[in-house]
Amino acid sequence: MTDQAFVTLTTNDAYAKGALVLGSSLKQHRTTRRTVVLASPQVSDSMRKVLETVFDEVIMVDVLDSGDSAHLTLMKRPELGITLTKLHCWSLTQYSKCVFMDADTLVLSNIDDLFEREELSAAPDPGWPDCFNSGVFVYQPSIETYNQLLHLASEQGSFDGGDQGLLNTYFSGWATTDITKHLPFVYNLSSLSIYSYLPAFKAFGKNAKVVHFLGRTKPWNYTYNPQTKSVKCESQDPIVSHPEFLNLWWDTFTTNVLPLLQHHGLVKDAGSYLMMEHVTGALSDLSFGEAPPASQPSLSSEERKERWEQGQADYMGADSFDNIKRKLDTYLQ
């Protein structure tokens, strides 16, 4: 159907690799809808050409250069730059209905049935289930909604500093108004939830349709060995106990995306065991993009509690299983 589309966003070349894997996985599972990627000016011309080979439409979005109220909002709320770029998805009025998907998601089966849902349909956020996670949602493009979201961003900002807080404020009735707008968790399975609720994953994980790689470390931050078809993980990494989705992401990348990057000169040498820090370097263990963000400064107990309540627990660091167990042991002795 040409009036419906899957939409994603990339704000740099690292996330563009995620978008390429997402777009490839949608095509692999034979979607009948169009695929669209919003790209900011930070995406290189070479990477944009690769995006054009996978997506039906590549739309450049520059909030700083826009003539609408998005520019004014950015001047007032500079911290919402990426959020305001994402909100542009509501301006795609050439489509009657869309499904937005973050670039760190991977499609595991055909999900065209999502277009039977109404705005705003989304899955619960694992950190605070009365809020929806904005990594996958069904929406209806509308200039009126777009302008109202910009006004809300300008006047109130976002309670979590990103698009999820803003969208949950705007669509505040999601939790209680209409249960049909609650997507099953399998449409937005958080990779961190596998670690935090393993019994449920063992019972229902086989039904997953979309996996969402939440957290600071993204699939492209890992190192992959094409010979063993496995990702190299640190022993304390939560994903190490169930790396199948991560390996699947990399399999999709090496099969469908890597040849395109090579063809466009973004990868010079894709040998069997290389290391690459930048997009155009030599490779060994396949490792693309930027390193994971540097460790955050230590937080107070109140700040950590606040992050937990916002679904931002540091599962890789202070809030790791080992640290939580160690703390519990001190009380149980």
UniProtKB/Swiss-Prot annotation:
Pathway: Glycan biosynthesis; glycogen biosynthesis
Any GO BP annotation: glycogen biosynthetic process
GO terms under cellular component: cytoplasm; nucleus
Note on how the cofactor is bound: Divalent metal ions. Required for self-glucosylation. Manganese is the most effective.
Binding site for UDP-alpha-D-glucose: 9, 11-12, 15, 77, 86, 102-104, 133-134, 160, 163-164, 215, 218
GO molecular function annotation: D-glucose binding; glycogenin glucosyltransferase activity; glycosyltransferase activity; manganese ion binding; protein homodimerization activity
PTM-bearing positions, type N-acetylthreonine: 2
Annotated glycosylation sites: 195
Modified residues (Phosphoserine): 44
Compartments, record wording: Cytoplasm; Nucleus
Reactions that this protein is recorded to catalyse: L-tyrosyl-[glycogenin] + UDP-alpha-D-glucose = alpha-D-glucosyl-L-tyrosyl-[glycogenin] + UDP + H(+); [1,4-alpha-D-glucosyl](n)-L-tyrosyl-[glycogenin] + UDP-alpha-D-glucose = [1,4-alpha-D-glucosyl](n+1)-L-tyrosyl-[glycogenin] + UDP + H(+)
Amino acids binding UDP: 9, 11-12, 15, 77, 102-104, 212, 215, 218
Residues the record lists as binding Mn(2+): 102, 104, 212
Chain segments carrying region Interaction with GYS1: 284-316
Entry EC number(s): 2.4.1.186
Cofactor(s) the record lists: Mn(2+)
Region ranges (Disordered): 287-316
Chain's role: Glycogenin participates in the glycogen biosynthetic process along with glycogen synthase and glycogen branching enzyme. It catalyzes the formation of a short alpha (1,4)-glucosyl chain covalently attached via a glucose 1-O-tyrosyl linkage to internal tyrosine residues and these chains act as primers for the elongation reaction catalyzed by glycogen synthase.
Family statement: Belongs to the glycosyltransferase 8 family. Glycogenin subfamily.
Protein name according to UniProt: Glycogenin-1
Organism: Rattus norvegicus
Source lineage: Eukaryota, Metazoa, Chordata, Craniata, Vertebrata
Gene that encodes it: Gyg1
